[in-house]
């Protein structure tokens, strides 16, 4: 954990969102495979502290969007990976990673359904559609660690909830197979 680096991550993403708004764009859009809306940095940072992410080595974000959760996770883990199909969001992840000099984050411009999640200590999702549309099957087949689900919506039906907690009114749930 590094509060100074976290502050820099927040500043970098704040600038990105302000630039979008100046151009008349909202910081959310369709990616062609789903829908992107950014995570709230302070909530994710607090959740990562609560689950003691620093005691784990690997993290993967399925549908990592602009990479914010991955760069925050990289402050805790040895290796943080993000998979994002939208090229503009993928490029923004790489840009902020370089600017912030966070070397233990890795980003792939790909469909996360084609990326194995086996072997990761934590899998992060902020789902944009019901789990029964393919995500839950992937998790049931490949999840070897824990799932950190962000939000009150689209929870898996066949995984076991280990922990649930609120951060600023938003729900985080830890699941296992």
Residue ranges and their predicted role:
Residues 56-63:
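Conserved class I S-adenosyl-L-methionine
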Residues 79-83:
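Short beta-strand element of Class I
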Residues 86:
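Conserved SAM/SAH-binding beta-strand->alpha-helix loop
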Residues 101-112:
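Conserved SAM-binding strand-loop segment of SAM-dependent methyltransferases
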Residues 131-177:
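C-terminal substrate-binding/active-site "lid" region of AdoMet-derived donor-dependent transferases
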């Amino acid at each position: 954990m590094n509060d100074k680096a976290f502050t820099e991550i927040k500043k970098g993403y704040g600038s990105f969102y302000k630039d979008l708004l100046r151009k008349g764009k909202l910081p959310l859009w369709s990616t062609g495979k789903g829908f992107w809306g950014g995570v709230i940095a302070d909530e994710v940072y607090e959740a990562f502290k609560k689950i003691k992410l620093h005691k784990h080595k690997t993290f993967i974000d399925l549908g990592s969007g602009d990479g914010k959760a991955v760069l925050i996770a990289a402050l805790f883990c040895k290796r943080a990976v993000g998979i994002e199909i939208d090229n503009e969001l993928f490029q923004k992840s790489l840009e902020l990673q370089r600017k912030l000099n966070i070397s233990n984050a890795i980003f792939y411009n790909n469909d996360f359904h084609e990326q194995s999640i086996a072997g990761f200590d934590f899998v992060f999702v902020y789902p944009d559609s019901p789990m029964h549309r393919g995500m839950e099957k992937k998790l049931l087949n490949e999840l070897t660690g824990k799932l950190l689900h962000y939000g009150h919506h689209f929870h898996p039906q066949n995984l076991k909830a280990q922990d649930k907690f609120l951060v600023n009114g938003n729900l985080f749930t830890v699941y296992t197979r």
